[in-house]
Amino acid sequence: MSDARFGMTIPFDDVPLHEQADWVRELADLGYTDVWSSEANGADAFTPLALASVWAPSLRLGTAIVPAFTRGPACLAQSVGSLAQAAPGRLAFGIGTSSNVIVEGWNGIPFEQPYER
């Protein structure tokens, strides 16, 4: 048995979230082990993973990445905790600084000293 893992980034472009259930289920049927979501365009990182946790219960879920600057610590902990409870043992949480484009340009938050935050 192989320990290899195969992942796909979700949500799929140009497909509404509510129409992606069959696609996500098919990923598991095709042998994919993981789905990953980020916050760059469109949906937040957590909603597609919450949906995938129900649509394909065998898939491991991961954020790649959630920006530390754009949510307060309590709100971020609530989001991670809720998804971890919805999919016990299946969540890999990635957090990072993101970029000045997303933090400052999109959210109007100063992107200062990103590695000290």
Which residues does each PLM region occupy?
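N-terminal beta1-alpha1-beta2 module of alpha/beta enzyme domains
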Residues: M1-L61, F69
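Structural motif
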Residues: S38, A64, G94-G96
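Glycine-rich, flexible loop/turn motifs
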Residues: W55, L61, I65, S99-N107
